[in-house]
């Protein structure tokens, strides 16, 4: 099946007998979402969840076999899209525009990693990570922004708790996700006054192919211990957070989605530690009561 082909499903049913097709919204009403990096891991899980719930998904991937697999899912059209290739991004925009469904949501999910000490990381590997993880969302968001603004829709970017934590040997990946955090915050400040809600999803340790792909790139092979993430749970909770960010009337700016309390404790603890460092022996510092007052005010705004 051509990767850009629309899948037309025609159901014949006796009067008064409901079928699965009856639950799918008509094209004009069926909200559409573009998901990058949809071939596996979080992207695949998000694609399947959205399609199952009756939304239409433009599922972006690079490899022909992945495109065919995505096309086999009801309510999904695959799009060949490498987020590092502007010409493929432009072609994807044109395809979505011509399809006539509009675009309610964008999920920037495509991501890569490399491992190793920063002082030993090759510049080309660092550029590779930033090209996909930082410039990728920037390119795709910039290209699809007119369609999202037109629909008053949502932009959701998959960040990571690594965008808050900074731990070896994932320094390059963590650098890129810190940049994604700034990207999301700035985008929200720019677009929310125009009616577009922006969210960041910060997953912890879930099952995905990112470690395997990183292991292969670093010459460690697909079967190295570092590549094995089978001990981690499937990212169902991450998909739930994405759906909430895309369609809830009151989406959150940030969704920290972790499989265990320890990861949450480490992440929140790191944010608090940075707060203490910012306040410690500085030209303008605040005592405990003043900090608690600031915290209470922030908690009040989040209600």
Where are these regions (language model features)?
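Substrate-binding pocket helix/loop in short-chain dehydrogenase/reductase
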Residues: 117-118, 125-127
């Amino acid at each position: 099946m051509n990767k850009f082909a629309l899948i037309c499903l025609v159901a014949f049913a006796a009067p008064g007998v409901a079928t699965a097709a009856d639950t799918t919204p008509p094209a004009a009403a069926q909200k559409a979402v573009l998901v990058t990096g949809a071939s596996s891991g979080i992207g695949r899980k998000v694609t399947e969840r959205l399609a199952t719930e009756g939304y239409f998904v433009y599922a972006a991937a690079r490899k022909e076999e992945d495109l065919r697999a995505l096309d086999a899912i009801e309510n999904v059209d695959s799009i060949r899209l490498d987020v590092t290739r502007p010409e493929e991004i432009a072609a994807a925009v044109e395809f979505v525009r011509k399809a006539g469904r509009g675009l309610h949501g964008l999920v920037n999910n495509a991501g890569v990693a490399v491992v190793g000490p920063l002082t030993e990381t090759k510049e080309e590997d660092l550029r590779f990570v930033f090209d996909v993880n930082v410039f990728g969302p920037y390119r795709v968001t910039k290209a699809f922004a007119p369609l999202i603004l037109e629909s008053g829709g949502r932009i959701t970017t998959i960040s990571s708790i690594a965008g808050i934590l900074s731990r070896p040997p994932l320094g390059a990946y963590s650098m890129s996700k810190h940049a994604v955090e700034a990207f999301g915050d700035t985008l929200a400040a720019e677009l929310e006054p125009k009616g577009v809600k922006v969210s960041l999803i910060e997953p912890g340790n879930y099952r995905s192919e990112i470690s395997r792909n990183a292991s292969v790139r670093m010459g460690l092979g697909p079967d190295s211990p570092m590549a094995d993430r089978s001990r981690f749970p499937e990212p169902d909770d991450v998909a739930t957070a994405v759906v909430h960010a895309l369609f809830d009337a009151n989406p959150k700016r940030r969704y920290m989605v972790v499989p265990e309390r320890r990861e949450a404790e480490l992440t929140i603890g790191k944010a608090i530690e940075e707060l203490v460092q910012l306040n410690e022996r500085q030209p303008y510092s605040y005592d405990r009561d003043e900090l608690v007052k600031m915290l209470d005010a922030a908690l009040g705004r989040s209600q």
